Structure formats: structure tokens, C-alpha cells
Amino acid sequence: MKKFICIILFASLHLFCRAQNVFDTETPPDMEGSNSSLSSDSIPESNVPHFRHTWQWERNGVYKREVALDTLMDGIQNFNTIFKKNISNTYLGNFPSPYLSNIFITRETVQDFYPLTQIRAFLFKPEDALLFNTTTPFTRLKYFTGGGKGKAENLLDVWHVQNIRPWWNAGIRYQLISSDGRYMNQKAKAYHFSLFSSYEKERIALSFFLNQNNGHFAENGGVKDISFIIDSTNQKAENIPVNLSSNDISNNYRNTNFQLQGQYNIGNPKEVTTPTDTFTTYPAKAIINIRAEGNERRYKEGNIAFDFFPHTYIDSTSTTDLITNQVYDISTKFVMNEHPKYKYLPGIYAGLDFKHENYRQRTTFDSISHTESFGHTRYSGTYITAGIFNVDTNVSFTYDIAGKLCVLGHYAGNFKFDGYVQQALRKDRSSYIRANATIELQSVNPFFDRYVGNHDIWENDFKAIKTIKADGRYVNNRLRTELGVGIANIFSYVYFDTAAMPQQTSKTLMVLTAWGKQNFRLGNFYFDQTVYFQKSTQEDILSLPAISVYSHNYFQHALFKNALFLQTGIDVFYNTKFYADNYMPSIMQFYNQRERKTGNYPKLDVFLNLRIKRADIFVKYEHINYLLKNHGDFFSAADYPINPGMLKFGIKWDFFD
């Protein structure tokens, strides 16, 4: 009832505001022309035409990257956040839940507060936010749901953005993902609330972001006996025994973000016109970026599960493990911008970054006196940064190359050089080749240095990790084709072994990847295919599926003089067998296992998507092949099956004037 009331309240905003599309960027292959970072609503209902300009600042303010938006419904039925980011994942079957991409090159960047790395897709952080300039306000409402009482799965996403003045924009966003879980003790929730704003007038540009992410995951330790899933039984999912039968075991997190960026433009202004915008540029600018982040992760047990956890060190009655962290980051840069007249004259910049981290956690435990102490561990680093770039959209050859070297503090000696070069193959830049590369030496995340929990204790002095990565791709938008290859060499790789303890290997880990994406069309039928091939040279520490496939097949057609847009089809997710990681609830991390392989099981979803004016509606049956025999080897993580079949539906509604 509360959710229904919230939906009505937010929907009523359309009586006094207007809306537009922002966060989804996937476009059906026949409608690329509607995808623009500066576009107008196709249904005029106001004397003021609706235009929107959206962008992000790259390299902490060095240059703008225009973010193309769309108003299409393709992919709305695939609303599980992790599968919008990666076509194959190891996860706990629930939405939301911790996850690990099975595609190595798309794995999440390690977060400063490491426990957040495995839930990154459910966080909204400053680097995810878009900046806006709109002629009219807008509101978007998304509500997706499935299951019934006791097994419901819901997503509510509401946001509103508007210009207060032509040069000043502000917005809010609220998202809630919740699930009762199909198996016992799987209740989960992830939600965030965000405020953001941007200001650009004459020589001054400002952007502001403030939000908080929260989450709660009940832990069940996976199913106790995999035969309940693999063999034919009539046992309902909610009655299948699990390893942690108590309903008072959970992981909880909180992440708070603040960012303020200021830019001051220097020199004589010059007006520049592009196909999508007209703007003013200056020869140079000075930038300051201030970021603060607060984190907390808490693991709780009301009663100790001695038969599941091999060790209990501190308290034999209950568990409360807590880690907190604060990150402060200040960066300054001086930028010489690209010259608007001489297209191939690059921009350059240099600056200083200062980063400070403070961890508070249990630091010692005396097993004889059973006393414990808590303390602070502090890390800091001062970095020199520099870069060169030419990202002018009117030239055929573009690049962005940056370097960062820590000269003072705990991270002294760490460095990172990364960038890309891209060459257009056609005058309209509809096809191109691109190469990306990264060389990095990074100290091991503090999470691996020391941890003292009720079930897990370690103290390590690991070497810094050196990473060399490169990939290249060929993209042809006219043929709807992408082909790519990549290689990653990692020296002193850190992982969790079969006992869920962190280890560092002396072997060089190499991962080879190749992929292809091809969208075929036959009349109104579309067949969008994505496939990844992978090979790890150290299968004993990193197992990956050799082949992963996402097949998106559908029929789409406009009816009733374009009043109704219809799309119906089937999605197939598949990967070959491999040793998928298992999951340890007490540290909220995935770890190696070599007891059994998972995979070689296609998951099929059938769907119907409809667009009626500005409302997108979908109905789908997820995991429909489960109905054929109600069993099978449909595990994701080693002890965690994916959900049985479920009917889901939802609506996405944009309000304009």
C-alpha cells in the first residue's frame, strides 16, 4: 500500500512538470536517429519546445563527454541491473544480491571501500550522475514488479530534473530495489536518494552531488543439498533447506557521497557550433574537485551457525562485525583546452591530487583473555597528474591519454597510465577502430591487509599489483557490428582461495578475451547477438566460462498509425561450464571452489513490450524453461541457484509538457 501511494504521489508531478529520458541508452537498430544528447520530444504539447542537453565531465572536469539519450523501450524487460552491465554473472540468484561478472574485462573497478565492489551496480555515485540543461522540467517514473505474496520482487525508480535558470539545473532521484527472495532467508533491499545540480554561466562552471546508498541482504548460505535443484522433485523453492536457516543473519551497508567541482575559464571566449549544440569555449581553465565518501559495512548473526562456519573466534553467541571508512579526495588541474580552429591541436593538462583514507575496525583479538580492541588505520597519497587529449567530434582521429604518479604518502610509487586512440573509417564516423590500454601499479586494497571478524581473521603484507591491459575493437554502426580482442596481464594477483582467505599468487595471470556483437534484421524481425570467448592461463585461481552468449530476438512493429509500438520476443542467456565461485556471507565475498562446475544451462525469458505515447509497458516470463521440468542444473554461484520461473511486468512513464 505504501508503494502504491508513493507511485500516485510521484505520478501526480506531471500536473506541474515535464519529463525526459536519461538513464537508459540502448537503441533498437532501426531508430539510431532518435538517439541524441540534444533532442526534442516528438509530441509537442507546449509553446516551449522540449530540448535537453546531457553530459558528464571526464577526468574530473577536463572535458565534456556528450551522453546520447534515447526515448526507446528496447531492453526495458531486462531490468536486473547486473545483466544490463554484463551478459553473464555469478550471483546469488536474487535481485538485488552481491555479484561477480563472468566476463573478466567488464568486472567492476575495485572500490576504495572494497566490500562495495561486489554490489557496485546497485550504487549511485558521483561518476554515474549526468549533468543537464533542459528547456522544460521532466519527471520519470519506473515501477517493475513480479512474483506474489512472500516472493515479490520490486523496483521503483523516480527522478525529476529541471532548470531553475537557463544556466542553473537541479535534480533529485530515488530508487528502491527490494525482494522477498524465492528461497528461504533471501530478503534483500538496496536503495538510494540523490540530489544533484549544475551551474554554467560565463567563466564559472559548478557541479554538486550529494547522496546516500543503503542496503540489506539476508544471508542463507546457499542450498544445503543441490539434489533438490538438479533432480526432479516437487519441493517448492521456499521449502528447500538452506545452510543458514536462521532469519537473523544479514549484511548491511551504507555509502554516502559528496562532490563539489568548480571551474574557472581563462582567456577570450569563442563561440563554437557543433551538430548538437552551440557553446562557448575558452583557451584555458582551472579546476578544483572536492570529494568526500563515507562507508559502513556490518555483518550480524543473532545465533552462531557452527555447522556452517569452520571458525568462530570472538563470540560464540552472536556476531557483529563492523568496518567503517572515510575517503577524502581533493584534486586541482590547469587545462589548456583544444583549439576550436585548429582541430588537431590537442588539449593538455597537469595537476595535483591528494587522497586520504581512514578505516575503523576491530584490529586485535586476544583468544586467551577474549578481549578485543578497535582502532583507526590511515592511508594517504599525493599524486602528480597530467594528460593530453583531442576529443573534438569533428575530427576523424581522437585520443585521450592520462598519467598519474604518487610521489608522497602510503601509496608512493603507485602509478597509472591509461587512454585510448580512435580512428574513424568513414567521413560520417559511423565506423571506426579503437584501441585502449592501461599500465598500472597499485597497492593492494587495505581490506586485504587486515581483517578481524568473528569467523574470519587475516593479516597480510602483500606486494603491489601490476596490471597491463590492452584491447582493440572494430565498430560499424551501419552494419550493426562490433568485433574486439583484449589481453590482460596481472602480476601478483590477489584472490580468495578455497578457504575464503586472501592469497597472492607469484604466477603471472593472463586473460585473453575476444568478442563479437552483431544485430541482424529481416523485415520487422531482429536478432541481436553478443558472444564472448575467454581463456585464463591460471585456471586454478581464476576460472572463467570459455563462451558466454546473450541472444536478444524480437519482432517489432508500429500499429494504429504509430499510436502503439509493439515488441515481442525471447532473450537467451548462456555460458559454458566452469568452476563458478562460491560465496562467504561473513565477509560478503566470492571465493574459489573446485568441487563442481556450473553452467551449460540456457535461461530463457519471453517478453512483450508496448509503447503507448510516453508510457512503456512490459510483461515477461523470466526463466520460462523452468516450467518444462521444474529442475535442472541452474546454479549461478556454486551453492546458489537462480530463481525459478516468475511472471514480471512493469511500466516506465515520462511526463512532458
Locate predicted features:
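Solvent-exposed loop segments that connect transmembrane elements
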Residues: 224, 232-235, 310, 366-374
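Exposed, low-structure sequence patches enriched in small/polar residues
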Residues: 4, 136, 248-303, 318-657
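Hydrophobic h-region of N-terminal signal peptides that target proteins for export
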Residues: 9-18
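Sec-dependent signal peptide recognition
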Residues: 2-8
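Membrane-proximal, glycine/serine-rich, low-complexity loop/turn segments characteristic
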Residues: 20-256, 265-280, 424-430, 639-644, ...
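Short coil/linker segments at helix-helix boundaries
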Residues: 240, 306-316
